[in-house]
């Protein structure tokens, strides 16, 4: 996905989020603000973490009013401390009030993912293993959540189903066997650079190697099974460990020497980073 396409998609999703929240009008703001009055408000971080999503935060207000100005004191990827001032937002107070929740939802969610990803990625430092996300993302938030993973030091697996072949258990069941599924994928999508197959036992590992899989995902296998699987694979395919990956066991898994470790928790279980807009006043 190129930069222009990503921007158009992001704008569309942000606009939909604003429609969802504001609907026909912000009745509370309109009841206390009868006309345009300029104001400013401080963007403050209330937890230590890694910031991500500042441009998305900014875009929320720009789509409501292009005259809104934001001065940031941090950039995406920066480590932030509790109580730190991240920036100042200036503009029509009605816009600041109506856009506040949507803007913060994006920033808190994305910063939470970046923070959690960073804490896991640090455990892989100094190894060859790359930390990957999955497609287990919040509906209509994937473009933002996968960006946040990258900010936190992780890597993106497939963005969508068009990005590559990943043969999972149900695909294999539909095809009839690992071998048949891999051959069908090769016949249908020869332009795809790599074909990945998910395996659950050593027999499937052997079959995937013999069928010529490019990447073999060891899914929910025990540590000892994975050690044996790597001996079977013996460099004939890249390797990925997935399933029940936690911060508590990831260092042990890294010790196996797999090429990739994928974790859905990076996006589906990361807590938000507490960030707020405080001190709104007329200028």
Put a short name on every predicted segment.
Residues 271-280:
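Structured adenosyl-cofactor binding patch, chiefly the S-adenosyl-L-methionine
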């Amino acid at each position: 996905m190129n930069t222009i396409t990503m921007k158009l998609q992001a704008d569309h999703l942000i606009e939909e989020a604003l429609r969802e929240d504001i609907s026909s009008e912000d009745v509370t703001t309109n009841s206390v603000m009868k006309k345009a009055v300029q104001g400013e408000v401080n963007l403050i971080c209330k937890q230590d973490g890694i910031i991500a999503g500042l441009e998305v935060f900014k875009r929320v207000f720009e789509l409501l009013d292009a005259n809104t100005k934001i001065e940031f004191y941090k950039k995406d990827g920066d480590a932030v401390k509790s109580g730190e001032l991240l920036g100042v937002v200036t503009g029509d107070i009605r816009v600041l009030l109506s856009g506040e929740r949507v803007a913060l939802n994006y920033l808190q969610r994305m910063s939470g993912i970046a923070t959690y990803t960073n804490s896991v990625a640090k455990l892989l430092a100094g190894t060859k293993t790359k930390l990957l996300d999955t497609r287990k993302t919040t509906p209509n938030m994937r473009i933002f959540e996968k960006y946040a993973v990258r900010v936190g030091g992780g890597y993106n697996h497939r963005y969508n189903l068009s990005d590559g072949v990943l043969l999972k258990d149900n695909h294999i069941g539909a095809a009839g066997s690992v071998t048949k599924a891999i051959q069908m994928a090769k016949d249908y999508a020869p332009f795809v650079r790599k074909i990945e197959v998910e395996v659950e036992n050593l027999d499937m590992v052997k079959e995937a190697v013999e069928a010529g899989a490019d990447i073999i995902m060891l899914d929910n296998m025990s540590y000892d099974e994975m050690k044996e699987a790597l001996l079977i694979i013996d460099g004939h395919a890249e390797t990925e460990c997935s399933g029940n990956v936690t911060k508590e066991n990831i260092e042990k898994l890294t010790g196996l020497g797999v090429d990739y470790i994928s974790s859905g928790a990076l996006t589906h279980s990361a807590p938000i980073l507490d960030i707020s807009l405080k001190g709104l006043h007329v200028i």
